[in-house]
Amino acid sequence: MVESSSVRNRKPPGVRREQILTVATEAFGNSGFRGVSLADIAATVGISQPGLLHHFRSKEELLIAALERRDEDSFSHMAIVFNGASTVDGLLALCRHNQENPESMRLYAVTAAESIEPAHPAHGYFRQRYVRVRSSVAGHIRRDQDAGLLLPELDPDETAAEIIAVMDGLQVQWLLDPSVDMCAVMETYLRRLTRRESADGEVVR
């Protein structure tokens, strides 16, 4: 019995789903949510639009799934790099990880900007995400203040919001102009938050 080409080309559901998410990440990152259609994504994957809808019921659902996959990778990496590392070292490791994944970074930057509009499908997603990330970074700041690694006068919540703003802004600058050494600039900024002592034990500001 000879298999048809459609049977031979059929991929396991998990493999096909990942393929769709990879294509969607690039498409949404390059063109934004409204600049790309499900038909475009399906054609790039090599399946029909009904075939794509078998995995994701709508373009909105596909966008959120792509963002969730990106965050799953990001938060998993954060858990690894922050294990036993200082806030500064952990954030710099995360910066380098992001730089190694430009398609993922572009998806984040473009969609975050679009989601300012309340009607955007990712508006609620990004509001919740920023709350989660600010809380996580603030917790690391408090830990390092207790350990004497960061300046005690820093407000952890305000500093967490500031760090995220700096990192997000540097990512946009790097996407626009790769000659910007975003991780070097990030390190210079973060080192200003650290507690340093002179040879005679005085704290250096």
Task: Identify the role of each PLM range.
Residues 23-30, 77, 107, 114, ...:
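Solvent-exposed, amphipathic alpha-helical segments
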Residues 2, 16-19, 23-65:
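Helix-turn-helix
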Residues 100-124:
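Amphipathic alpha-helical segments used for helix-helix packing
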Residues 1-15, 200-205:
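N-terminal intrinsically disordered/low-complexity leader segments
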Residues 119-131, 146-193, 200-205:
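Hydrophobic/aromatic-rich alpha-helical bundle segments in the mid-to-C-terminal region
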Residues 60, 71, 164-168:
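Conserved acidic functional residues
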Residues 68-74:
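Short, basic, alpha-helical segments at the C-terminal edge of helix-turn-helix-like DNA-binding modules
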Residues 65, 76-105, 156-163:
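Hydrophobic alpha-helical connector segments
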